[in-house]
Regions:
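Bacterial N-terminal signal peptides that target proteins for export
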Residues: 2-12
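Short, ordered beta-strand-loop transition motifs
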Residues: 12, 81-83, 126, 350-351
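Sequence-pattern detector for short linear motifs
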Residues: 12-13, 363
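Hydrophobic alpha-helical transmembrane segments of integral membrane proteins
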Residues: 13-14, 57
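C-terminal motif of bacterial Sec signal peptides marking the signal peptidase cleavage site
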Residues: 20-23
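Extracytoplasmic soluble-region selector
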Residues: 25-114
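Residue-level hotspots at or immediately adjacent to binding/recognition sites across diverse folds
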Residues: 114-432
């Protein structure tokens, strides 16, 4: 039988468009549009320790198929971030906040700044009142100003503020969050608390109390009770600084000898560890810091010409002589960070003209010129965090003694127009 191929081909060609049309549908979805980028509302952000802020992130293009954002923090010990982009500071430091969508990310470089606490006093024209400042603003008054009183040292542990000083009676005291925690002495003899340090929940204080013979005796208290009586009361002695390291209690101060000169000393657990000077000239040790098992002390020693010379000792031996001894100088506080030794104090740069100094590893790092260089000015305390150097003290002027905090090479805060800034503490947040 003969097949009619031409007719069959015509039928097939006529049916092909119908087949092709049947394979296409108006309901097919177009390819989804991907995310091109994520842009943060702020590329950088600074927060205080108790700070919060909400960031927003914009996903492009606007018609991207999936614009769902996922938020994360590179270090939740520094800051956390919620699913809505709310950042909550936890501890001073640096973290990267990331918003991610569709395989793309936007970032914000976050810095959480520490809180700066200062202990000192405010003069009202009649008396000094003991005061604590936080970030440049008065946090609390420890005394009522009816008698001269001074806050000499501040230490912050897990957000609790401890302060040491005297109440003007004068009774050596420790305050906790502005309220009296311990009266270290009974007020029958003059006493002062010079330094406070908190470790393992215990509160250590260094200072002195006069005995019945009118001689100051260097002491260390723990939780309000005498822990160590450092000297026997035969010669004048003062404990100026306390530091706890690996459970050991280090104290710096000075004690007189029979010739009437003071010897700079360091005690460990109540026993003399180092006599820093030989007693041929008077010397004072004001500050002790322990790092890597080494004991650093700052103070001064008089030379044979009767000039005080600022010095730093390490493990009982002179590490740095900070001035040449031609004119007076003094080192009041030492801090060790990342192996570098920072010291603050004052140096006479010409006859009766003074410069506030910060030294690093024995060399001048920062110099501050007081408003009136012929008036008494002083840097009392130093602290270092993240490479930034904080110092506290006061400048002399004809109108008073403005208490100030400096950061690196510039003034950070003027705390009061007439008073003293005795101690600075950089609080970085809760213990890890």
């Amino acid at each position: 039988m003969k097949t009619n191929y031409p007719i069959l081909r015509q039928i097939l060609f006529a049916a092909m468009p119908l087949v092709l049309l049947a394979g296409c549908s108006d309901t097919d979805d177009p390819a989804p549009i991907g995310v091109a980028g994520v842009e943060m509302s702020k590329p950088t952000l600074e927060l205080s320790l108790d700070g919060t802020e909400r960031l927003t992130a914009t996903v492009t293009p606007d018609n991207a198929a999936d614009k769902t954002l996922t938020w994360s923090s590179s270090d939740e010990a520094v800051a956390t971030v919620s699913s809505e982009g709310v950042i909550t500071a936890v501890r001073a430091g640096h973290a990267t906040i990331t918003a991610a969508a569709g395989g793309k990310t936007g970032t914000c470089a976050l810095t959480v700044n520490p809180d700066i606490y200062v202990a000192g006093s405010v003069y009202d024209g009649n008396n000094n009142a003991a005061v604590v400042w936080k970030n440049g603003k008065k946090l609390c008054s420890l005394t009522d100003g009816k008698q001269n009183a001074y806050a000499n040292s501040v230490f912050v542990s897990d957000g609790v503020v401890y302060t040491a000083g005297n109440d003007g009676k004068p009774v050596a005291k420790v305050w906790k969050d502005g309220t009296e925690l311990h009266a270290l002495t009974d007020g029958t003899q003059y006493a002062d608390a010079s330094s406070v340090f908190v470790s393992g929940g215990a509160v250590y204080t260094a200072g002195y109390e006069y005995n019945k013979n009118g001689t100051p005796v260097a002491k260390v208290w723990k939780d309000g009770t005498v822990l160590h009586t450092l000297t026997d009361g035969k010669q004048y002695a003062f404990a100026n600084s306390v530091f706890i390291s690996d459970g050991a209690v280090y104290t710096a101060g000075y004690e007189g000898n029979k010739n009437g000169w003071y010897i700079a000393k360091v005690w460990k657990d109540g026993t003399e560890l180092h006599a820093l000077t030989d007693g041929k000239q008077s010397a004072h040790a004001y500050s002790v810091f322990v790092s890597g098992g080494a004991v650093y002390t700052a103070g001064y020693e008089y030379n044979e010409n009767g000039k005080s010379v600022a010095k730093v000792w390490k493990d009982g031996t002179v590490l740095h002589t900070l001035a040449d001894g031609t004119l007076d100088s003094d080192a009041s506080s030492v801090y060790v960070a990342d192996g570098d030794v920072y010291v603050c104090g004052v140096e006479e740069v010409s006859e009766n003209v003074y410069m506030l100094q910060v030294w690093k590893n024995g060399k001048v790092l920062h110099s501050y010129t007081p408003a009136d260089q012929k008036e008494e000015s002083y840097l009392n305390s130093i602290s270092v965090w993240d490479g930034d150097v904080y110092t506290a003290g006061y400048e002399g002027s004809a109108d008073g003694y403005p208490a100030k905090v400096w950061k690196n090479d510039g003034e950070l805060y003027t705390l009061t127009e007439d008073g003293y800034a005795s101690s600075v503490f950089v609080y970085t947040g809760p213990e890890r």
